[in-house]
Design a protein with these regions (language model features):
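Generic detector of multi-pass transmembrane helix bundles and their immediately adjacent loops
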Residues: 1-81
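Divalent metal-dependent catalytic cores for phosphoryl transfer on phosphate-bearing substrates
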Residues: 70-216
Length: 216
């Protein structure tokens, strides 16, 4: 308000050279404009809730690695955290190349593996010599790996992450198989018809180009 008022006063003084000719109504308009700007930021979040969209402002805030959930991941699953940072940079660069929304895919990449925080030691990037999968069957190991999708969605719900971020969590493996455990099981049971659903991620497959970039 003050900036608008001072600029208007200066320009009018230059052009009119007469203070009595100043249009005082303009100051009222400047004041109204200042009030609207003051409420614009909180209104943005209200509109997001009502209409179900996520603004770039929200995505930028979520991508701050000092927020509580990402900070927790860096402590509980440091290998996964580093992997997510690398994926965020790579996926954002790839999205830029194909005309995708780089900020969206960057933020989605930061959160896509948050479910690994529930059982961090079962994922290679967090292991330090001991592999807990050795005490499990191939089917059990596959279910632990697959569960990082459902666990991630539960954490996303708990922390009120927007739907567009949840979609990255659910789609980043699509309907693919946990191939290592599936192939290992098949090799040990060559005469058995294997139920692929025991080794399959719940999906769905990616349905936006940003999700497809992250999956690749």
């Amino acid at each position: 308000f003050i900036s608008y008022a001072l600029l208007y006063f200066a320009f009018e003084l230059i052009h009119e050279d007469d203070l009595t000719k100043l249009n005082t109504r303009m100051y009222i308009y400047f004041m109204i404009n200042g009030i609207l700007l003051l409420f614009a930021y909180p209104l943005l979040f209200l509109l997001e809730k009502i209409f179900g969209f996520t603004s770039d402002v929200t995505l930028v805030e979520l991508s701050n690695i000092n927020n509580s959930l990402l900070r927790e991941m860096s402590e509980v699953a440091p290998g996964t955290f580093q992997h997510s940072l690398q994926m965020a940079n790579l996926a954002a660069a790839a999205a830029n190349k194909i005309g995708g929304k780089s900020q969206l895919v960057r933020t989605g990449a930061l959160y896509h593996d948050i479910g690994k925080m529930v059982n961090p030691a079962f994922f290679t990037e967090n292991q330090s010599g001991v592999n807990p999968h050795k005490s499990l069957s191939y089917e059990q190991s596959a279910q632990v790996i697959i569960s990082h999708i459902t666990d991630g969605l539960k954490l996303a719900e708990k922390h009120n992450l927007p739907k567009v971020i949840k979609d990255f969590i659910s789609t980043h493996h699509g309907r693919g198989l946990t191939k290592y455990f599936y192939i290992s099981y098949k090799n040990e049971h060559p005469d058995e018809e294997v139920d692929q659903e025991k080794f399959r991620y719940p999906g769905p497959n990616p349905f936006t180009k940003e999700q497809a970039v992250l999956m690749m």
